[in-house]
Amino acid sequence: MGLSSIFGGGAPSQQKEAATTAKTTPNPIAKELKNQIAQELAVANATELVNKISENCFEKCLTSPYATRNDACIDQCLAKYMRSWNVISKAYISRIQNASASGEI
């Protein structure tokens, strides 16, 4: 028994086989962790969107307290932000899917 076997350094063919097996075997814990991270990122993105919308729209639209024109301005600003967010999200998802399909990711 050599030192390489003690420290996990078996033959190169054994290392390749172990690495290939590890990559191809689906790990339910890893999958669950990826799902949890994806959910947390989605919540963080939604929170960031709400914060930016609130900050920008209210700063732009609230010129005087309780003015009726504030409501229309805020509604239009929110709609604009949501349309922009949807366009950007679709483009981002498309790029990620294309990169994943071509093996870049």
UniProtKB/Swiss-Prot annotation:
Placement of sequence motif Twin CX3C motif: 57-77
Single annotated GO MF: metal ion binding
TM region positions: none
Membrane topology, as annotated: Peripheral membrane protein
Effect of residue 61 to S: Abolishes import into mitochondrion
InterPro entries: Tim10-like, Tim10-like_dom_sf
Keywords for the protein's UniProt record, in alphabetical order: Chaperone, Disulfide bond, Membrane, Metal-binding, Mitochondrion, Mitochondrion inner membrane, Protein transport, Translocation, Transport, Zinc
SS bonds (residue pairs): 57-77, 61-73
GO terms under biological process: protein insertion into mitochondrial inner membrane
GO CC aspect terms: mitochondrial inner membrane; mitochondrial intermembrane space; mitochondrial intermembrane space protein transporter complex; mitochondrion
Region (Disordered): 1-27
Compartment(s) of residence: Mitochondrion inner membrane; Mitochondrion intermembrane space
Family of the protein in this entry: Belongs to the small Tim family.
Quaternary assembly: Heterohexamer; composed of 3 copies of TIM8 and 3 copies of TIM13, named soluble 70 kDa complex. Associates with the TIM22 complex, whose core is composed of TIM18, TIM22 and TIM54. Interacts with the transmembrane regions of multi-pass transmembrane proteins in transit.
Domain remarks: The twin CX3C motif contains 4 conserved Cys residues that form 2 disulfide bonds in the mitochondrial intermembrane space. However, during the transit of TIM13 from cytoplasm into mitochondrion, the Cys residues probably coordinate zinc, thereby preventing folding and allowing its transfer across mitochondrial outer membrane.
Cited function: Mitochondrial intermembrane chaperone that participates in the import and insertion of some multi-pass transmembrane proteins into the mitochondrial inner membrane. Also required for the transfer of beta-barrel precursors from the TOM complex to the sorting and assembly machinery (SAM complex) of the outer membrane. Acts as a chaperone-like protein that protects the hydrophobic precursors from aggregation and guide them through the mitochondrial intermembrane space.
Protein name: Mitochondrial import inner membrane translocase subunit TIM13
Species this protein is from: Saccharomyces cerevisiae (strain ATCC 204508 / S288c)
